[in-house]
Amino acid sequence: MSELKQIRIYTDGSCLGNPGPGGYGVVMIYKQHRKELADGFALTTNNRMELLAPIVALESLKEPCDVILTSDSQYMRQGITEWIHGWKKKGWVTASKTPVKNVDLWQRLDAAAAKHKVDWRWVKGHAGHAENERCDTLAREAAEAKPTQIDKGYQP
C-alpha cells in the first residue's frame, strides 16, 4: 500500500449572535500547496460552524490521507475524540438521556473522519497562531457577508 498523503488542516467557525448569521473557514496545506475554503449561512450557531468546517475539509479530500487537523474548538475536538463513542453506543443520546445536539453534523464528521487517519489537535484561539487566525478571518467574513444559504440541520 502506498503511503498516505500528509495534509495539515486548520478550521474555525464563527457566528454573529449565536444563533445568527454564521460561517466557517478552512486552511488546507499539502506540501507547498495551500487551499482556503469558506462559506456562510443565514441562521446557525457557532458550534454548528465549528463542526461544519472540518466536515467540509475532510469531505473535500479525494483519497484517504494522513491528516493533522487543528482547531480552537474544544467542543469539536472533545466531541469527536471522546464523547462520540458513548453517543453512538447509546443511540445518539447524552449521558443525561437527552438527544445529542447537532447530531446531523456529528454523524457527518464521524463518517468523513473514518476515511482518513486524523490527529485531532487543539490550539488556543486568538493567540497569534497564523493559520488559526486566517480561519477566524475567513469564517467571520463569511458570516458578515449577509449569507442567504440555509443551514438545513439548524433547530432553534
Curated annotation (Swiss-Prot):
Ranges for domain RNase H type-1: 3-144
Keywords, ordered alphabetically: Cytoplasm, Endonuclease, Hydrolase, Magnesium, Metal-binding, Nuclease
Chain sites annotated for binding Mg(2+) 1: 12, 50, 72
Catalytic reaction equation(s): Endonucleolytic cleavage to 5'-phosphomonoester
Cofactor info, note text: Binds 1 Mg(2+) ion per subunit. May bind a second metal ion at a regulatory site, or after substrate binding.
Cellular component GO terms, alphabetical: cytoplasm
Pfam assignment, any one: RNase_H
Root EC class: hydrolase
Entry's Gene Ontology molecular function annotations: magnesium ion binding; nucleic acid binding; RNA-DNA hybrid ribonuclease activity
Summary of subunit composition and partner proteins: Monomer.
Family, as annotated: Belongs to the RNase H family.
NCBIfam families listed in its UniProt record: PRK00203.1
Protein name: Ribonuclease H
Source organism of this protein record: Shewanella amazonensis (strain ATCC BAA-1098 / SB2B)
